[in-house]
Regions:
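Active-site catalytic microenvironments for nucleophilic, acid-base chemistry
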Residues: 88
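A structural signal for small-residue-enriched, beta-sheet-centric alpha/beta enzyme cores
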Residues: 2-76, 80-83, 91-323
Length: 323
């Protein structure tokens, strides 16, 4: 059966929007799931996540659907942006009906970009609302946009030897089955091309002319590091038109982390907040393990596209500079 590439927006019941402040080097990306919402799961592997409403996605939680996912910069400060998404959805009568109003269920994960641009400007409710307006036209783009505006990679020795990254996406169709991924790449580790194993972006030598292997730096000294650089976190979403419930989607999110592991080294560290959501947007019957394996593959490709589509900015070089 032939597999073909499709757009990340080629899923029914999905709208994706970006909003950013390019001068301040921060932004957010929203995924809206319509009036009916969508089942979702979450798997967090990093040691330092910044998140909102993540408890909703645990298998024992009562909620079976959510209405939106927001990926954002700003670290924990950026969690304010979800308020704008809630406002947008409430105005349109979207949410969990509690009689007196409808409460939109909005999950959010943030990355750390405070050291790239202006630390005093972070995604807020106004920016979250603007991302929703952008989603009406599916204004999503890969690169230095949305949650990827201030993203960077390879920060083992700090910002002076890291590179610019961004947000990326990739989706495929296999028969009637669709699987896609969107990811903002902001890792401590180096990014590798999952297809051939070559370094694409990451930690550089002091003169910023050559790549350094972050794992070699880690292995060179096993003593406890008190001031490890913590400004990291890769956050992503896997999408499918196959029908799954929350427990199954948590497993799919876990399998998608294989895509992180193929592309980022080291990954899932105590200085990262690596998280992946999985969302079901259809009724198609499909094998969970097949979708999980595809989820890992599209996530790896989305990571690659996130760094390949990024442009040099804020004094940071990009992968295009090393081609």
């Amino acid at each position: 059966m032939a597999m073909k590439e499709i757009k990340i927006t080629d899923f029914e019941g999905l709208q994706i929007g970006n909003a950013e402040n390019a001068e301040a080097a921060t932004g957010c990306t929203v995924l809206l799931f319509g009036k009916d919402g969508a089942p979702a799961g979450l798997d967090v592997r990093g040691g330092g996540p910044a998140s909102r409403e993540s408890e909703l996605l645990k298998p024992m939680a009562a909620a079976q659907i959510i209405h939106a996912i927001l990926l954002s910069g700003g670290s924990a400060f950026g969690l304010d942006a979800a308020g704008g998404v809630q406002k947008y959805l409430e105005e349109r009568g979207i949410g969990f009906d509690v009689g007196v109003t409808k409460v939109p269920l909005v999950c959010q994960s943030d990355l750390f970009d405070l050291t790239v641009g202006r630390m005093d400007v972070r995604p807020d409710a106004a920016m979250g609302y603007a991302a929703c307006l952008g989603a009406e036209h599916n204004n999503y783009r890969d690169g230095n946009y949305g949650a990827g505006t201030g993203a960077s990679v390879g920060k083992m020795t700090g910002m002076g030897t890291c590179m610019k990254s961004g947000i990326g996406s990739y989706a495929v169709q296999l028969g009637d089955l669709k699987v896609g991924a969107i990811v903002a790449v902001n890792s401590l580790g180096v990014i590798y091309n999952w297809r051939d194993g070559h370094k694409v972006a990451g930690m550089l030598t002091p003169d910023c002319k050559h790549f350094v292997d972050s794992e070699d730096v880690v292995f060179a000294d096993y003593e406890v590091v008190e001031n490890k650089f913590v400004g990291n976190t890769t956050i992503g979403v896997v999408l499918t038109n196959a029908a799954f419930q929350k427990t199954q989607l948590c497993k799919l999110a876990g399998m998608a982390h294989d895509g992180y592991a193929r592309s980022i080294r080291p990954v899932h560290t105590s200085a990262d907040g690596d998280s992946i959501y999985a969302v079901s947007l259809g009724k198609l019957a499909a094998d969970q393990d097949v979708v999980g394996a595809l989820g890992a593959r599209v996530m790896s490709e989305a990571i690659l596209r996130a760094v390949q589509s990024a442009d040099a900015a804020y004094g940071l070089p990009c992968a295009k500079d090393f081609q």
